[in-house]
Curated annotation (Swiss-Prot):
One of its GO terms (molecular function) is structural constituent of ribosome. The keyword RNA-binding does not apply. HAMAP family: Ribosomal_bL33 (MF_00294). This is Large ribosomal subunit protein bL33A. The gene is rpmG1. GO terms for biological process: translation. InterPro entries: Ribosomal_bL33, Ribosomal_bL33_CS, Ribosomal_bL33_sf, Ribosomal_zn-bd. Belongs to the bacterial ribosomal protein bL33 family. GO terms for cellular component: cytoplasm; ribonucleoprotein complex; ribosome. Keywords: Ribonucleoprotein, Ribosomal protein.
């Protein structure tokens, strides 16, 4: 079987994709939103789930 693709988290301020994580889409259908460190902004910002192209 094919592996699951990771969920990408992008910074809300600068739109840079900094993190890749996994989530259970059946249990958590809404978009993931976490406070994470952004190296471009040099601080903690909200990172939201970004749609794959």
């Amino acid at each position: 079987m094919a592996q699951k693709r990771g969920t990408r988290l992008g910074c809300n301020d600068c739109n840079e994709i900094n993190y890749i994580t996994r989530k259970n889409a059946k249990k958590n259908p809404e978009k993931l939103s976490l406070n994470k460190y952004c190296s471009r902004c040099r601080g903690t910002t909200v990172h939201k789930e970004v749609k794959r192209k």
